[in-house]
Each structure stands twice: as C-alpha cells, then as structure tokens.
Amino acid sequence: MTKASVLIATLGGQPQVVTFALDALLAQNEEITAVYVIHLSLDNLRTRQALTRVQQEFAGDQYAGRRCRLRRVPILLAGAPLADIHDEAGAEATGQTMRTLLGDLKRDGERLHLCLSGGRRMMALLALSAAALLCDHQDRIWHLYTPDAVRQQAAGGALMHVAPAAGVQLIQTPIVPWG
C-alpha cells in the first residue's frame, strides 16, 4: 500500500464526482485518510444538495468501512461564502482558498490527490495554478472521465458508486510542479 494521502475535490451540483474519484483511488490501493471538498456558497440549492449527499457517504468519519474524514472548504470573500465567480474579486478569493488549502496540507506533509472535475471551471483552473506552485512530484492531479450514459444515470447523485465495468476512470493530468 502507498503512503497515506488526501483527496481534494472541487464540488458543484454533481456529488458523485467526489465518490467516483474516491472509489477509483481506493481501487488503486491508495490510502485516503481525508477528503476536502471545495465549494461555493450553499445558498445555491444544487451545491447544498450535492454537499448533503456527499456528507451522507461519510457518516461517523467512515467511508466504505474505512476511516476517512470529510472536510468542507467553502470559498469565502470578505468572510462571507462566495455565491459565484463572476468577477476578479471572486477569482482572487477562489485562488486564495486553493493556495491556502494546498499550502497548509503540504506544510503538514500530506500527499495530495486533486480531482478538479466538479464545480465551476474557474475553480479547476485556479486549483491547477495553486498546484503548480505548491505541489511536488508525489502529488497527483486527476480528471474524472465518466461515460455519457453513466453521467446521465448518475446526474445529481442518483448513483454515488459504479462498478469498474461502467467505464469511469481517473485520468492523470500531467503537470510539472514548480514547488
């Protein structure tokens, strides 16, 4: 088994992105001890429902019979949850959230898996930028590929887990870290 690590996932309205990615990592014998879900304001009904659905999978800091804690990371602007990334201030707040989270986890010696397939594209772009600065060669950045038929069946968290034969795959995103 590999060194313990954490999963960081961006979240929008599709909660299964988090569990599909985590299931794929566990199937690769990764020991994931925590999942950090980065999200915009819970005033958005889809985001709130998605987070609630993800939280149901982590009752008692357990996931699929393993100890794994879920931590939510809201994006804040001036101390308030950011509703959406519609201007430069929102982009800066999102980037700062990404840099702070990744920096804190790296200072704690964590090995990171980043799944950037959920939520707004800008969240993924800013997380990728932070990863280039703060991650090292032991960290991994992933895109979650979900076949169209599975995506339709799983929409909104209707399916939170699928069999390997369903074709859901993590695709490693090449990045040369500066850190």
Describe the residue ranges of each PLM region:
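Long, low-complexity, Lys/Arg-enriched
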Residues: M1-L112, L125-G179
